[in-house]
C-alpha cells in the first residue's frame, strides 16, 4: 500500500516541478483524437522542445495546489493532457492552436503563462503572436529603417551634387 502512495508522491513532485520550471503550460482535452493524431501532435511538440504528458487529474490537482495555481482545478476534468515548455513561451500554444484548427476534437482548456493562470482566449491570443525569431526580425527591421533612410538621403544628396557639378 505504501508503495503506491510513494509512487503517487513521486508523480505529484514531478508535476509540481514541471509547473514551477515551465515558462508556458497548456492544458488540452484530447478526447476524440486517434492514437496516430496524438502521436503526430506529440512529435510536433517534441520537435519544438515541448513536453506533452497525460497525468491523472487527482495527482495534477495536488501538484497545482502545491504551486498555488488553484485556478486550474476547474479545468481538470475529463481526459487531459498537459504541454510544458521550459524554453519558448509561445511554442506550445502556437503548435496546439494550429493542430486544433485541423483537428476539431482537440480542445484547449486553459494554460499557465509565466506563473499565471491563463484562459482559453489568452492562450489563443498568445498562439497568434509571431515566434521569437519573427519578433526579433521585426525589431531588427524597425531599428534598421532610420539608418537605411539616412543612407538613401545621403546618396540622393551626393547624386544631386554630382549632377550639378557635371
UniProtKB/Swiss-Prot annotation:
NCBIfam families hit by this protein: PRK00099.1-1
Family: Belongs to the universal ribosomal protein uL10 family.
Keywords tagged on the record: Ribonucleoprotein, Ribosomal protein, RNA-binding, rRNA-binding
Oligomer status and interactors: Part of the ribosomal stalk of the 50S ribosomal subunit. The N-terminus interacts with L11 and the large rRNA to form the base of the stalk. The C-terminus forms an elongated spine to which L12 dimers bind in a sequential fashion forming a multimeric L10(L12)X complex.
GO cellular component, one term: large ribosomal subunit
Gene3D superfamilies xrefs: 3.30.70.1730, 6.10.250.290
InterPro entries, A to Z: Ribosomal_uL10, Ribosomal_uL10-like_sf, Ribosomal_uL10_bac, Ribosomal_uL10_bac_type, Ribosomal_uL10_CS_bac
Xref: PROSITE patterns: RIBOSOMAL_L10
GO molecular function, one term: structural constituent of ribosome
Record's protein name: Large ribosomal subunit protein uL10
GO biological process, one term: translation
Keyword rRNA-binding belongs to the record: yes
PANTHER family per the UniProt record, alphabetical: 39S RIBOSOMAL PROTEIN L10, MITOCHONDRIAL
Pfam families: Ribosomal_L10
Record function comment: Forms part of the ribosomal stalk, playing a central role in the interaction of the ribosome with GTP-bound translation factors.
Amino acid at each position: 500500500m505504501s508503495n503506491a502512495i510513494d509512487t503517487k508522491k513521486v508523480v505529484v513532485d514531478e508535476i509540481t516541478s514541471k509547473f514551477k520550471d515551465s515558462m508556458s503550460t497548456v492544458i488540452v482535452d484530447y478526447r476524440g483524437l486517434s492514437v496516430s493524431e496524438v502521436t503526430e501532435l506529440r512529435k510536433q511538440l517534441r520537435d519544438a522542445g515541448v513536453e506533452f504528458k497525460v497525468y491523472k487529474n487527482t495527482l495534477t490537482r495536488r501538484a497545482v495546489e502545491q504551486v498555488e495555481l488553484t485556478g486550474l482545478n476547474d479545468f481538470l476534468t475529463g481526459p487531459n493532457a498537459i504541454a510544458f515548455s521550459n524554453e519558448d513561451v509561445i511554442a506550445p500554444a502556437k503548435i496546439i492552436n494550429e493542430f486544433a484548427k485541423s483537428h476539431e476534437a482537440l480542445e484547449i482548456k486553459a494554460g499557465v503563462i509565466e506563473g499565471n493562470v491563463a484562459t482559453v482566449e489568452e492562450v489563443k491570443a498568445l498562439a497568434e503572436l509571431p515566434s521569437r525569431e519573427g519578433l526579433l526580425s521585426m525589431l531588427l527591421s524597425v531599428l534598421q529603417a532610420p539608418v537605411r533612410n539616412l543612407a538613401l538621403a545621403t546618396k540622393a544628396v551626393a547624386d544631386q551634387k554630382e549632377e550639378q557639378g557635371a
